[in-house]
């Protein structure tokens, strides 16, 4: 069943004698694949249009191919990884693999009003609810498709009721209603600031959504912290494709190292930042599979199409880089990556 593209977490409940459960799982997966094919077809059309426009001498004064591709179709509403089923599986694998490392100390009292900004497909939402029973969780995201996926995931995990709201962070706080100023005790942001062109503005809005004395929790990665053995120029070049696309979109793939100054400047007090290193070697085959193969390498591999379209790499070079990244997950390989977790108090 893993060969169909299902994640480990999805396959596990269907292994056994329950053929009905397995059939339901596969039928749902088939529907997700249909969505994936539709997305890829649309992506192909956008790419063709972008390349045609870039070659038109009357269009944007013959803008360079790279920038036209980025402007027209690569960024998928400024989210460099895209909104599709495979990305949803990657985010879910990431959340499960890193749950204890990132969320072991994420604790909110029962009855707390908690807001998750940019919940995506709900991968982190499930963890927040599992570790904090009794909280009143509200999740917002700009993508209706992601919210539908999040709703399904939360339902399958039989979590407590959650408010899922389609909203743009930059439109908050609202003048009235659920998302008005000072409405929450705690705000959580996971892997969102790295994609924003104005993270300082986003943090200011998060602060205004909190009551005085409420807390903000932010978790972000830092691609510049990546180190591995065997070392490989091709692997570094493939990672650099992701980094360059993200920066071209206005994001910051190394934002983890900037959390302390960002939160301090945004008006938070008692800012505490801790590094959370993922270290993988032959003694951690679970992390080699869950993080190196299914999270980090899958993330880099996910930008293959836009990277080639933008002329950042050739198919041969990019694929060689992915192959070399996978070597670091073998028994004699080593991989290291650092996340940063910040907790602060709203003044």
Per-range role (PLM):
Residues 174-187:
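A short acidic, Gly/Pro-enriched loop at the edge of an enzyme's catalytic core
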């Amino acid at each position: 069943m893993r060969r169909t593209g299902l994640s480990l977490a999805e396959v596990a409940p269907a292994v056994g004698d329950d053929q009905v459960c397995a059939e339901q799982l596969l039928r749902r997966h088939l529907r997700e694949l249909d969505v994936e094919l539709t997305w890829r077809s649309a992506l192909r059309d956008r790419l063709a249009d972008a390349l045609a426009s870039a070659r038109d001498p009357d269009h944007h004064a013959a803008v360079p191919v790279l920038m036209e591709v980025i402007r027209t179709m690569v960024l998928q509403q400024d989210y460099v990884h895209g909104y599709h089923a495979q990305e949803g599986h990657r985010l879910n694998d990431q959340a499960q693999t890193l749950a204890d490392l990132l969320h072991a100390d994420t604790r909110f009292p029962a009855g707390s009003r908690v807001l998750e900004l940019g919940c995506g497909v709900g991968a982190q939402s499930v963890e927040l609810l599992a570790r904090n029973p009794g909280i009143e969780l509200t999740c917002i995201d700009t993508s209706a498709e992601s919210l539908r996926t999040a709703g399904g995931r939360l339902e399958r995990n039989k979590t407590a009721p959650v408010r899922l709201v389609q909203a743009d962070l930059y439109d908050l706080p609202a003048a009235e209603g659920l998302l008005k100023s000072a409405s929450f005790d705690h705000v959580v942001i996971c892997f969102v600031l790295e994609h924003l062109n104005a993270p300082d503005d986003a943090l200011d809005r998060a602060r205004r959504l909190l009551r005085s004395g409420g807390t903000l929790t932010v978790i972000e990665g830092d691609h510049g912290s990546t180190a591995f053995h065997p070392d490989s120029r091709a692997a570094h070049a493939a990672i650099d494709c992701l980094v360059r696309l993200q920066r071209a979109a206005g994001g910051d793939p190394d934002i983890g190292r900037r959390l302390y100054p960002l939160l301090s400047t945004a008006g938070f007090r008692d800012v505490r930042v801790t590094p959370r290193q993922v270290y993988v070697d032959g003694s951690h085959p679970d992390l080699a599979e869950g993080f190196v193969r299914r999270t980090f390498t899958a993330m880099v591999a996910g930008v293959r199409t836009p990277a080639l379209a933008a002329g950042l790499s050739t198919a041969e070079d990019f694929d060689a880089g992915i192959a070399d990244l996978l070597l670091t997950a073998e028994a004699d390989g080593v991989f290291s990556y650092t996340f940063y977790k910040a907790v602060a108090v709203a003044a």
